[in-house]
Amino acid sequence: MEPIPASRSTILLETADPASEAARACLQAYYDELARRFESGFDVALSRDPDAADMRPPRGSFVLARRDGLPVGCVGLKGHGGELAEVKRLWVAPAARGQGLARRLMQCVEQTALQLGIRVLRLDTNSSLPEAIGLYRSTGWVEIPRFNDDPYPDVFFEKTLHDAL
């Protein structure tokens, strides 16, 4: 994937290995924020796919957002082989919030999913993240019943993708 420049911004999106140093830095910042915001804390070892191994080609993808070369956001696409996948680990650094970056990351992961033949995306989140829930609802995600046994999420969404994203 070629870097995608942001309009009126220096933030670029690029695919990355989730095990790369920049990706690990974003993921650790994400985990630290969840630990602060969740009443019960957060331990990535208790979540599904703690090492993000399924967020790699050919079934998945991991996207980093960089400003001046530094990571400021990320999102993962966890493919299951077939037309269904999960969006995981959406995070934007506090200094980069309020600029539409989370929306851009979600658009990028949806486009990638379509390129991989994925037609239905699911995601889970926690009610302690109302800004994420608002983003999902405003971009066409529909709340669905629980679809996994991960201990942290309590809100679940699904979106059917169409070729004209």
Feature-to-residue mapping (PLM):
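Active-site acidic-Proline motif in GNAT/NAT acetyltransferases
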Residues: A93-A95, Q99, S127
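Short coil/turn segments at alpha/beta junctions that flank glycine-rich nucleotide-binding fingerprints
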Residues: E83, Q99, Q115-R119
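Actinobacteria-biased recognition of intrinsically disordered, low-complexity terminal regions
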Residues: M1-P5
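C-terminal "cap" of GNAT-fold acetyltransferases
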Residues: S7-R8, C26, R119-R122, N126-T139, ...
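Conserved GNAT acetyl-CoA-binding A-motif
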Residues: M106, T112-T125
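Loop/helix-junction capping segments adjacent to catalytic residues or to phosphate/diphosphate-binding pockets
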Residues: E21, Q99, P130
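Residues forming the Rossmann-fold NAD(P)(H) cofactor-binding site
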Residues: Q99, R103, Q107
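Acetyl-CoA-dependent GNAT
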Residues: S9-K88, A93-P94, M106-C108, T112, ...
